[in-house]
Swiss-Prot record:
Subcellular location: Cytoplasm; Nucleus
Residue ranges of the region described as Disordered: 1-27
PTM-bearing positions, type Phosphoserine: S21
Compositional bias (Polar residues): 1-12
Location, primary (coarse class): cytoplasm
Keywords annotated in UniProt: Cytoplasm, Nucleus, Phosphoprotein
Stated name of the protein: Uncharacterized protein YPL071C
Cellular compartments per GO CC: cytoplasm; nucleus
């Protein structure tokens, strides 16, 4: 039998699996950052990678995984709530997940793309038509209109 399994207290024939991690977001982000560090340290040189091993101190501090997904304010609030002695663990985790979910929710405005395309075409079309058929008073003057009778008798 594998050492990762443990026997149940009630039934000696019943095998109980080990518990999963309670923090899947932190584990996933830790693995992602660890993979990035490992990829940065890859080298084709004969000497090997730049660093012999990646430093975990940058990834974990006081058993809290620093992630890009958790905002600093939310993280500070989580740490503050976890150190205080008020409330049940279930309520605490519910508050954490609720705040993370609210922080990451996005409202996407629905847009009618057919209407936007039609209005864009309509504006373009009318701009094309109005630019061709405009009346420019200065450009349409005729030379004959400028002719002035210079033989006017001023003494009369």
């Amino acid at each position: 039998m594998s050492s990762r399994f443990a026997r149940s207290n009630g039934n000696p024939n019943h095998i109980r699996k080990r518990n999963h991690s309670p923090d899947p977001i932190g584990i996933d982000n830790y693995k992602r950052k660890r993979l990035i560090i490992d990829l940065e340290n890859l080298s084709l040189n004969d000497k090997g990678p730049k660093n012999g091993h990646a430093d975990d101190n940058n990834l974990i501090h006081n058993n809290i995984v620093f992630t890009d997904a958790i905002d600093d304010k939310v993280l500070k609030e989580i740490i503050k709530c976890s150190t205080s002695k008020r409330g049940d663990n279930d309520l605490f985790y519910d508050k954490i997940w609720e705040r993370l979910r609210e922080k990451r929710l996005q409202i996407i405005k629905w847009v009618d793309y057919k209407e936007i395309a039609y209005l864009s075409w309509w504006k373009w079309f009318h701009n094309q038509m109005t630019s061709k058929y405009t009346y420019d008073g200065e450009a349409d003057t005729d030379v004959e209109m400028m002719a002035v009778d210079t033989d006017v008798d001023m003494d009369a």
